[in-house]
Structure formats: C-alpha cells, structure tokens
C-alpha cells in the first residue's frame, strides 16, 4: 500500500463517482477500478459497494476511511517537517473560493503571502461558496474563502476579512417581472424568483420573503453558485438577491437594476476558514499568521 492509494481512496469516498475521481487524478476509470481492487485484495475486505448508479462505502470502508484520512494528514505533516529543515517554507496549500472571490478579494491576500513565501504553491479550486465548509471538514482543501456560517463548528476557525452587502436585482428587459414591478401594489406572490441552491444569499432572500409574508414564492429556477444567476435575471427570467461583489463583476450587470427596499439587507461576513488542527501545519500556520 502506498500513500497515493490512500489519497485516491479518500477522493473516491468523497465523490462516490469513479469517473470524477479518475478524471481529477489523471487516470482512466478502469485504472482507478484496478487500483481500488488491489487495495481491497491487500486488506482482504470489500471497501465499496458498486453498481451502475452509485458507489457506497461498506462498513469496513467507513473504518478504513478514518484510518486513511489520519495517515494521509500525518504523511503531509511529516513531509512538511522535512522541508522545514530549510530556511524557507515550501510545499503546497489547497485553497477554495468562489469565482467572484477569486478576483474580488483573493488577489490582495495571495499577493502578500507570495511575497513572503515565494516557494509555496497555491492550488486553487473555485466553485459554489456554499460548499466551502463541507470541503474544509472533508479535508479536501486546507483553507477556504467563504461566508461565515450561522453555526460555526467548534473544529473550524474563521478570520473575517470583509462584510459583504447584498441587493435585490431585477431585469430591465420587458418581461413578466418588470410588468409586475410596475403594479401598485406589487403582487410579490406572482413574481418569479431565481434562488441559489444554498448559502447566505439563499438565507437572505428567504428571510426577506418571510418579512413580506410570502409563504410560497414562485421559484423559476434554483442555481448552484451565484455567477450564473445574474445573466438569468438580465434575460428576464426573474428577480434574485445576490452579493454586490457578484453583481458588480458580472458582464451582464448593465442588463439589471437594483431595487430600492424599505429595509436594508443584512450583510454577511466573508473570511478565511480552516480546521483548527490544520494550524499545526507550518504552511497553514504561516498563512493564518499573515492574516492576523
């Protein structure tokens, strides 16, 4: 058994998809299948239940996953300790953030870190910010730039870097939404909305609708992430509540209008988060010290 076997096993346990894991680790699904089979043969236990629809961990697989995560983290820490014998930090940090945050907030943070530690490689992954905490807890990334959750797990630490404001936006093109906005009073019950799947923007629009006493809003679509919602609003499919940073950076922001609301929308905190135990790793500790 090699440490790369543990890494592949952990990745497959997270994706539960042979094709995704194979693609992201630059191998064919058949090669991945053979690698997992060799691991199972070595252990003498079946780790995954496979069929055409899903991949699921067995009871032994769940136990081995805990072992694999611990050993993989120990291996990464040991490698870093060996590198720390040199005067300058080097190695790799895995960082996650949204597409918008990658150019609205991340450049300033990375610029300073790279100036201090030019030999450290940043492996950046972008995606739906609502996934940040899940990726941190699953040890898929070391650090994440994301909104502070309402209930921060005790195993996670958060360092605030900004307050993020939000706006309710509407299309400018003639459509059902613009027609309804011209009515007095506005029939919010018939207004089409575009929701994020989850996250702070989803929480804020749901709170706003509750305050409007709209129990069953008309949801045109539910979209993962934020960046794809602005074009949908601009094309006339409905209203949406989004972070202003997302709206301002969208190439479609000239096709939408911000609505004036009776009550301002509560902003949320944006920051860097990581698992507390990650602060024992020299690279993460150095990154965290720079923030403070």
From Swiss-Prot:
A GO CC annotation given for this chain: cytoplasm
UniProt keyword annotation of Transcription regulation present: yes
Short name of one Pfam family: HTH_1
Keyword entries, A-Z: Activator, Amino-acid biosynthesis, Branched-chain amino acid biosynthesis, Cytoplasm, DNA-binding, Repressor, Transcription, Transcription regulation
InterPro entries membership: IlvY_PBP2 (IPR037404), LysR_subst-bd (IPR005119), Tscrpt_reg_HTH_LysR (IPR000847), WH-like_DNA-bd_sf (IPR036388), WH_DNA-bd_sf (IPR036390)
Cellular location(s): Cytoplasm
GO biological process, alphabetically ordered: amino acid biosynthetic process; branched-chain amino acid biosynthetic process; regulation of DNA-templated transcription
Signal sequence range: none
NCBIfam families: PRK11716.1 (NF008722)
Function description: This protein activates the transcription of the ilvC gene in the presence of acetolactate or acetohydroxybutyrate. IlvY is also a negative regulator of its own expression.
Family: Belongs to the LysR transcriptional regulatory family.
Protein name: HTH-type transcriptional activator IlvY
Species of provenance: Haemophilus influenzae (strain ATCC 51907 / DSM 11121 / KW20 / Rd)
Native organism taxonomy: Bacteria, Pseudomonadati, Pseudomonadota, Gammaproteobacteria, Pasteurellales
Gene: ilvY
């Amino acid at each position: 058994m090699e440490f790369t076997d543990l890494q592949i096993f952990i990745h497959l346990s997270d994706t539960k998809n042979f094709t995704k894991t194979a693609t992201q680790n630059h191998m064919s699904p058949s090669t991945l299948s053979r690698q997992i089979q060799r691991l199972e043969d070595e252990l003498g236990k079946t780790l995954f239940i496979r069929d055409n629809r899903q991949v699921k961990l067995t009871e032994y697989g769940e136990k081995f996953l805990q072992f694999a995560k611990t050993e993989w983290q120990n291996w990464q820490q040991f490698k870093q300790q060996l590198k720390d014998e040199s005067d300058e930090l080097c190695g790799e940090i895995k960082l996650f953030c949204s597409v918008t945050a990658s150019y609205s907030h991340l450049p300033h943070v990375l610029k300073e870190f790279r100036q201090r530690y030019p030999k450290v490689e940043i492996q950046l992954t972008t995606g739906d910010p609502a996934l940040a905490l899940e990726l941190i807890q699953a040890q898929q990334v070391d650090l994440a730039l994301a909104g502070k959750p309402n209930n921060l797990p005790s195993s996670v630490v958060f360092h605030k870097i900004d307050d993020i404001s939000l706006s309710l936006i509407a299309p400018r093109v003639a459509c059902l939404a613009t027609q309804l906005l011209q009515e007095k009073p506005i029939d919010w019950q018939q207004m089409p909305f575009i929701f994020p799947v989850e996250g702070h923007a989803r929480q804020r629009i749901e709170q706003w609708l509750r305050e409007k006493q709209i129990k069953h809003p008309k949801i045109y679509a539910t979209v993962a992430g934020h960046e794809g919602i602005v074009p949908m609003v601009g094309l006339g499919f409905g209203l949406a509540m989004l972070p202003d940073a997302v709206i301002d950076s969208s190439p479609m922001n000239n096709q939408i209008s911000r609505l004036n609301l009776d009550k301002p929308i509560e902003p949320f905190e944006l920051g860097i988060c990581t698992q507390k135990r990650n602060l024992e790793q020299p690279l993460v500790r150095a990154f965290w010290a720079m923030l403070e």
